[in-house]
């Protein structure tokens, strides 16, 4: 995956310099950690290594924070606000989830605040508009947020599952292709044209780029929404509903 996106990024960048090389290396680190946490064995290792106490649990998030500050400094976007905001949206959810780790695994005010902090900071533009690689890449803070929230819920909170795994079987691929085709044909394209989100153009990307573009849309648009709404909110709400049903006479 990293090789594919590196080749695609190099094809889009007009000039290769040290900043581009460093940003692609950082991109590789973030993608590697993001994909790695889809493996249950990796998650179990992280729990054993960093889940013993609060200080050790915050070490990986501290690494993410240092990478964030370093990358912003390279882009010359480092301000007082940009030092404080990443500190809040990386560590506040982690602290809330640490104190919630022994409670039943259903939605409550701590879980909800942890999710909303990460979501609103990005949606409301409270984080810098930094891309990786610069100018023509993906949202840098989206990668940081995904790594942070997945780590916080799976390792610090100890959530049993959020449906995030990297071992799709034949049935997964069949349903994924079927529902993606139905969504594009009957919802995405018609609604996109009606709302002017999609428009006609005579400028086309080379055909070889389209598979990479679709993969990028899946990873950086579809995956975050699935993790947030289905992986976290849906599963935590399901836990709450099961609890309420078990308490009915």
Q: What is each stretch, according to the model?
A:
Residues 168-172, 227-249:
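Membrane-interface helix/loop boundary segments of multi-pass membrane proteins
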Residues 34-47, 94-104, 159-163, 229:
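C-terminal ends of transmembrane helices
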Residues 86, 105-109, 127-221, 239:
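Juxtamembrane helix-loop-helix connectors linking adjacent transmembrane helices
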Residues 17-27, 56-155:
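Alpha-helical transmembrane segments in multi-pass membrane proteins
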Residues 31, 64-68, 122, 183-187, ...:
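Alpha-helical transmembrane segments of multipass membrane proteins
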Residues 59-62, 113-124, 172-185, 240-245:
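Small-residue-rich segments of transmembrane alpha-helices in multi-pass membrane proteins
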Residues 40-58, 161-172, 238:
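Membrane-interfacial, low-structure loops and terminal tails that flank and connect transmembrane helices
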Residues 1-38:
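N-terminal signal-anchor module of multipass membrane proteins
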